[in-house]
Every structure is written in structure tokens, then in C-alpha cells.
């Protein structure tokens, strides 16, 4: 048993130089003044000095980074990956054919992930689907396609400059390989075109006349504007947007498959033009009733309330369509937190201000939230009770206190009167996306 554990853990030994380190090694790395255990995911020897791409154990993937050898502590043991057993692949194949129904979805990792679909509400069927199983059930095109390759674990751009903002990417994005050796990649604020040198970018900027997303402006107030862009009509711009967003979204998006989507881009105006703040995409025809496919606030604008405005705007569109909607699952960790906060505040505000008896279906009709999202939110707020075969909601002191704080905050919100938009109608030929 002890030998098995040692084999699974790998082989630990001391090394004399970092030249002995290979991909898959686990070693101690200096991070923020502390020694942290990290796994080597990639090694770049194309330039000197060599760099190592590391993932810190028990830390979010977005903190992965390229480091120099000087940060690796070779005075402590390095764990090398266990040697591959040539018969292991054969055994796995035999095991797989013997048990075709077995799945590897229910892992310890998936159990730790907060998933909306696993929230049990009394009286509702709890399917108990893990995040991995849920991903397998989703369609394999559009925004939900997973990148199974090992290369997707390695962030390929070190830094981007977008307008006046310098940003460190979080994840891999399939930009052209020639950009991956550049210390900085320049991304145009308006066209989202990318460049490997400042000179190229400056020359392009002199010629480019675009000053806003290439679509129809459907909303404007004194704070933000929204543009609607058809992925089929503006393929290059939308692909550039997806490449950019993939740097900050780990779980979905296929950059070249933009035809089936409409993109709703939120911008801020100044004397130079409309600067992209965030966006959400939406399927032209969603069989599952999703009103959002991907949603992102760019990192330089996060924690300023823009994400909430994006979510609120998506529901305003659903109200105009006379539909209920929900975001495509699984949500990212930050997306899930934002949606839960929006659903909670919307439900509390409606219940307190309505003051009369109201059904869950009526709440759904007024807010465009699905009944499932309403029930899950009510359960999380601890205001849901199952009484005589039906769900009832009641307001407790915590909810009333939260309502007072909500009103005191005076958040910016979307003004429905300023939304100039009719739900687009597409013919069968327009919904064919073979190209």
C-alpha cells in the first residue's frame, strides 16, 4: 500500500540545478514572500533565461504564471512525475470496454464547486448532477465547447495593453503563435485587432476610423451605451472579441463559431469614442431558453457595478421578448456570484415593495427570471417554505434588513424607457450556420 502511494505521488529527490526540472515536476516556488508548492506545466527555452509556467497547488488557475529559475527553491526536494507504465494504457482500454456506463464526472474537485443545479430545494427534484457530467450533457458547438488539449492549461500571453490599460491575462486564448513570444501584445480599443509591436499598433491606429462596436446602438444613458452586433455580419470583430474574452474566461467560448450569436456590448463614451467595458452573447435561437451564452466584464472595469448592469440588461431584453430566461450553465465562479447577488436583490425588492400576495409564476412574469432560479434563490435566502403541497415565501428580519441596505446603496440601473429595440426575427435560411 505504501509503495502504491509513493508511486502515485511521484518520486521525490534533491536536484543540483533547475536544468533537471521537467514538465510535471512539483517544486517549491517563492510567491509573495512565501514558499508555495507548484506544478511545472510548461518550460520555455526559446529565449534566455528559460522560464517555467507554474500552477500553485490549492490556488485558482488564474494565478498561474511564468517565472524565472531564480524563484524555484532547489534546496528542498522536487517531486518528479511517476514513470509511465507501458501496460497502463492497455489496462485502461480494457477497463473502459468492460464498463461502458462508468463515468469519471463525480470527482472530489467537482464536489467542491458551487453549482446552481446541485442546490436542493424541498419539493423540487434534485438531480445531483456534477459539474463535469453537466458539461458532457451540453452541446458541443458555440460557446460551450471545451478545449481538451494540455496546451490550454498554459496561459500564452504575458501582458496586453488595451487603450490606456495594462492587463495581465488569466487563461489561455488561441491567438496566433507568433504573439506568444512577445512581452506585450497591443489590442486596439475599438476594433479589438491585435499586434505584436507598438509600432505596428500605432501605424494601424492612424488608419483605423472605427470608434465604436460595429453594430446598432440600442441603449444610451448618461453613463453607458449598448450596441447589438450580429456575429454573422461582423465575423472578424466578434472573433476578436471572443479571443479577448477567452483570456479571462476559462470554461467556454469557441472563437471562430460566432454566426449563431448576437453580441450585446456595453461601452463608456469619451472624446475618443466608445470604449468596450463588457459584453454578453446570446444565441439567436436557444432551444434551452438561455438568455445569455457568455458574459464578461473586462478586468479593468470589474468591481464597479458594470457586471450587474450587463445582467440587468439581459433581463430587460427578455422582458421585451415576453420570455423568461436564464444564463447558460455552467457559470464561472465570478459569474455565479454576480447572478446570485442579482437574483437575490431582485427578489427581495419585488417582495418587499409589492406588499400583496403574489405567486411565483407572477414573479417570473414580472422579472423574466425562471421559476427554478426564483425557487433556488428563495431557498438560499432562507425564505422558502413547503406548506400543504406548495411553496410559499415569507419575509424575515434578515431580508428586510438587506432591503434597507439595498435601497441605501442607490446603485445605477438600466432605464427601460431608453431601450430602443425590437426582438430580431430570423428566417430559417438566416439560422443556417454552415460556412
Curated annotation (Swiss-Prot):
Residues 78-108 are annotated as: Disordered. Its EC number is 2.3.1.48, 2.3.1.-. The active site is at residue 328. Keywords: Acetylation, Activator, Chromatin regulator, Chromosome, DNA damage, DNA repair, Nucleus, Transcription, Transcription regulation, Transferase. A zinc finger (C2HC MYST-type) spans 185-210. Residues 152-423 form the MYST-type HAT domain. Its main location: nucleus. It catalyses: L-lysyl-[histone] + acetyl-CoA = N(6)-acetyl-L-lysyl-[histone] + CoA + H(+); L-lysyl-[protein] + acetyl-CoA = N(6)-acetyl-L-lysyl-[protein] + CoA + H(+); 2-hydroxyisobutanoyl-CoA + L-lysyl-[protein] = N(6)-(2-hydroxyisobutanoyl)-L-lysyl-[protein] + CoA + H(+); (2E)-butenoyl-CoA + L-lysyl-[protein] = N(6)-(2E)-butenoyl-L-lysyl-[protein] + CoA + H(+). Gene3D superfamilies: 2.30.30.140, 3.40.630.30, N-acetyl transferase-like, Winged helix-like DNA-binding domain superfamily/Winged helix DNA-binding domain. The record marks 294 as: Important for catalytic activity. Autoacetylation at Lys-252 is required for proper function. Residues 78-89 have a biased composition (Basic and acidic residues). Residues 22-73 form the Tudor-knot domain. Pfam families: MOZ_SAS (PF01853), Tudor-knot (PF11717), zf-MYST (PF17772). GO terms for molecular function: chromatin binding; histone acetyltransferase activity; histone crotonyltransferase activity; histone H4 acetyltransferase activity; peptide 2-hydroxyisobutyryltransferase activity; transcription coregulator activity. The keyword Transcription applies. It is an enzyme of class 2 (transferase). Belongs to the MYST (SAS/MOZ) family. PANTHER family: HISTONE ACETYLTRANSFERASE, HISTONE ACETYLTRANSFERASE ESA1. Catalytic component of the NuA4 histone acetyltransferase (HAT) complex which is involved in epigenetic transcriptional activation of selected genes principally by acetylation of nucleosomal histones H4, H3, H2B, H2A and H2A variant H2A.Z. Acetylates histone H4 to form H4K5ac, H4K8ac, H4K12ac and H4K16ac, histone H3 to form H3K14ac, and histone H2A to form H2AK4ac and H2AK7ac. The NuA4 complex is involved in the DNA damage response and is required for chromosome segregation. The NuA4 complex plays a direct role in repair of DNA double-strand breaks (DSBs) through homologous recombination. This is Histone acetyltransferase ESA1. It comes from Eremothecium gossypii (strain ATCC 10895 / CBS 109.51 / FGSC 9923 / NRRL Y-1056) (Yeast). The gene is ESA1.
Amino acid at each position: 500500500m505504501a509503495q502504491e502511494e509513493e508511486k502515485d505521488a511521484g518520486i521525490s529527490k534533491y536536484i543540483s540545478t533547475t536544468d533537471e526540472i521537467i514538465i510535471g515536476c512539483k517544486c517549491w516556488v517563492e510567491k509573495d514572500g512565501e514558499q508555495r508548492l507548484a506544478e511545472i506545466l510548461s518550460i520555455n527555452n526559446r529565449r534566455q533565461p528559460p522560464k517555467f509556467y507554474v500552477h500553485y497547488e490549492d490556488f485558482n488557475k488564474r494565478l498561474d504564471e511564468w517565472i524565472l529559475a531564480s524563484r524555484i527553491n532547489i534546496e528542498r526536494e522536487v517531486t518528479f512525475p511517476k514513470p509511465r507504465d507501458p501496460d497502463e494504457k492497455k489496462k485502461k482500454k480494457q477497463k473502459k470496454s468492460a464498463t461502458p456506463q462508468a463515468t469519471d464526472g463525480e470527482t472530489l474537485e467537482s464536489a467542491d464547486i458551487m453549482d446552481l443545479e446541485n442546490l436542493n430545494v424541498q419539493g423540487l427534484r434534485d438531480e445531483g448532477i456534477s459539474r463535469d457530467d453537466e458539461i458532457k450533457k451540453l452541446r458541443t458547438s458555440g460557446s460551450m465547447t471545451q478545449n481538451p488539449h494540455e496546451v490550454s492549461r498554459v496561459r500564452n500571453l504575458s501582458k496586453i495593453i488595451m487603450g490606456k490599460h495594462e492587463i495581465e491575462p488569466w487563461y489561455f486564448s488561441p491567438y496566433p503563435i507568433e504573439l506568444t513570444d512577445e512581452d506585450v501584445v497591443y489590442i486596439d480599443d475599438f476594433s479589438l485587432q491585435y499586434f505584436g509591436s507598438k509600432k505596428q499598433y500605432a501605424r494601424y491606429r492612424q488608419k483605423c476610423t472605427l470608434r465604436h462596436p460595429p453594430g446598432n446602438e440600442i441603449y444610451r444613458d448618461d453613463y453607458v451605451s449598448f450596441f447589438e452586433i450580429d456575429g454573422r455580419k461582423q465575423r472578424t470583430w466578434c472573433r476578436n472579441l471572443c479571443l479577448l474574452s477567452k483570456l479571462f474566461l476559462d470554461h467556454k467560448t469557441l472563437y471562430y463559431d460566432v454566426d449563431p450569436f448576437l453580441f450585446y456590448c456595453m461601452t463608456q463614451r469619451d472624446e475618443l469614442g466608445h470604449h468596450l467595458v463588457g459584453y454578453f452573447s446570446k444565441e439567436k435561437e436557444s432551444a434551452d431558453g438561455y438568455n445569455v451564452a457568455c458574459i464578461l466584464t473586462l478586468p479593468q472595469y470589474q468591481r464597479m457595478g458594470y457586471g450587474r448592469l450587463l445582467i440587468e440588461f439581459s433581463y430587460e431584453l427578455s422582458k421585451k421578448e415576453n420570455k423568461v430566461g436564464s444564463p447558460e450553465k455552467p457559470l464561472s465562479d465570478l459569474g455565479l456570484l454576480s447572478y446570485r447577488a442579482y437574483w437575490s436583490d431582485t427578489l427581495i425588492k419585488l417582495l418587499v415593495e409589492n406588499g400583496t400576495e403574489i405567486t411565483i409564476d407572477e414573479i417570473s412574469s414580472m422579472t423574466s427570471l425562471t421559476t427554478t432560479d426564483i425557487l433556488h434563490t428563495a431557498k438560499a435566502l432562507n425564505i422558502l417554505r413547503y406548506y400543504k403541497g406548495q411553496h410559499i415565501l415569507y419575509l424575515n428580519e434578515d431580508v428586510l434588513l438587506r432591503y434597507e441596505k439595498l435601497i441605501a446603496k442607490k446603485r445605477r440601473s438600466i432605464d427601460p424607457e431608453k431601450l430602443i429595440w425590437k426582438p430580431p426575427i430570423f428566417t430559417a435560411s438566416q439560422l443556417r450556420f454552415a460556412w
